[in-house]
Amino acid sequence: MPLIIVSMYPGRTQQQKDEYAKAITKSAVEILKTKESHVIVVFEDNPKENWFLAGNQL
């Protein structure tokens, strides 16, 4: 059962998340040869100030 966690900046609409979750699920089904009902997608909205690259805030 794939659990796919998407971490991104806040600000996306629920419609955007719905569409993205459907696209991710479709890809997981095709690539991983699993059932749609087994794919879980979780969105984590994390403020930009929580993102760092090479020790530096983005």
What are these regions (language model features)?
Residues 2-58:
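A domain-level signal for the structural core that forms small-molecule/cofactor-binding pockets
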